[in-house]
């Protein structure tokens, strides 16, 4: 069994006198910085000067400064920037101001694991990765609970890296829900696999194929949209709350028998073999090398062509009209 921690097993004392420099103020940076501040830690925010994030962080009551200055002042440098800009900002602003005994902290380990950032040996390398979006991290904290996190130490120069890691996790509220020990390698490879094979890539492809199958079978696109896409959330919510068998116990007998006997026809051994191919391409660096090459040569255009194709698909056109009906006041 994996090592776990709960809130009452952890103290903030080891980091209460340290300065936490949050680098970046996007969805995770905003949530984690505010949670740590509300937990009584000394938080500063490092940002590019003059941007919207700077003004927002100041409005939220934070002491805001350049990334370079935040690195100088911080004891724990908590990097919450988008993956693809971490390497350059580290090289230009963080590395020149990083001194012995500080900690580089992350919520995703890709930059260290794939060596986009090559950290020195005289700092701690730690990770606190909430298993949910920043909005949920903040929302659950304010509800006096939290979003669970997986935590890891890659390099313990000071001998206090775990105290720092667990302190950050407690301060953002994650320890209230529970912490699970992992490793940088495991976090990166499983996170990317989840995104590609089921959570984003696999789920989107499955839904699209189901929609196309119904429409090609002569059914109305609007009905196909409900069956293939809209109702998925109801099932996922049950699986998340009660487990897979808990979901089966809460659907109709017809759905239970049909799903149990036909699901393996849809997701068969060939599907699992393809998942293994995806995992292998992550493990051996194929995906990382492809993604870096594509991003460096094309930037966001690396995925724009795929997004454009999706925008032109019937499921998107029908979906926009269906969502207007169900959420008339919302904008997309």
Residue ranges, per PLM feature:
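Rossmann-fold dinucleotide-binding core
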Residues: 105-196
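NAD(P)+-binding Rossmann beta1-loop-alpha1 motif at the extreme N-terminus of oxidoreductases
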Residues: 2-63
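Short, well-ordered alpha-helix to beta-strand connector turns
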Residues: 18, 40, 74, 101, ...
């Amino acid at each position: 069994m994996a090592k776990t921690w709960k809130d009452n097993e952890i103290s903030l004392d080891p980091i209460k006198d340290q300065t936490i420099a949050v680098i970046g103020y996007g969805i995770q940076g905003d949530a984690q910085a505010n949670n740590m501040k509300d937990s009584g830690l000394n938080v500063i925010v490092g940002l590019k000067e003059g941007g919207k994030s700077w003004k927002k962080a100041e409005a939220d009551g934070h002491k805001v400064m350049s990334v370079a200055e935040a690195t100088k002042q911080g004891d724990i440098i908590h990097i919450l920037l988008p993956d693809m800009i971490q390497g350059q900002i580290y090289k230009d602003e963080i590395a020149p101001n990083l001194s012995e005994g500080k900690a580089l902290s992350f919520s995703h380990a890709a930059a260290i694991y794939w060596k986009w950032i090559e950290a020195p040996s005289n700092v701690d390398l730690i990770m606190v990765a909430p298993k949910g979006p920043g909005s949920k991290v903040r929302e659950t904290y304010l509800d006096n609970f939290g979003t669970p996190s997986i935590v890891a130490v890659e390099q313990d120069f000071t001998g206090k890296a775990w105290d720092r890691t667990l302190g950050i996790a407690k301060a953002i509220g994650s320890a209230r829900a529970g912490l699970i020990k992992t490793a940088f390698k495991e976090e990166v490879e499983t996170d990317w696999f989840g995104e590609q094979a089921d959570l984003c890539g696999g789920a989107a492809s499955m839904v699209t194929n189901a929609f196309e199958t119904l429409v090609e079978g002569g059914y109305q696109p609007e009905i196909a949209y409900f069956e293939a896409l809209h109702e998925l959330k109801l099932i996922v919510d049950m699986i998340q709350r009660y487990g897979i068998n808990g979901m089966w116990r809460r659907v109709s007998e017809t759905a239970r028998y049909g799903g149990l006997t036909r699901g393996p026809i849809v997701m068969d051994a060939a599907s699992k073999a393809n998942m293994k191919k995806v995992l292998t391409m992550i493990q051996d660096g194929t995906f990382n090398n492809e993604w870096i090459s594509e991003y460096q040569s094309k930037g966001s255009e690396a995925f724009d062509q795929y997004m454009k194709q999706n925008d032109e698909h019937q499921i998107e056109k029908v979906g926009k009209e269906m969502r207007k009906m169900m959420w008339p006041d919302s904008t997309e």
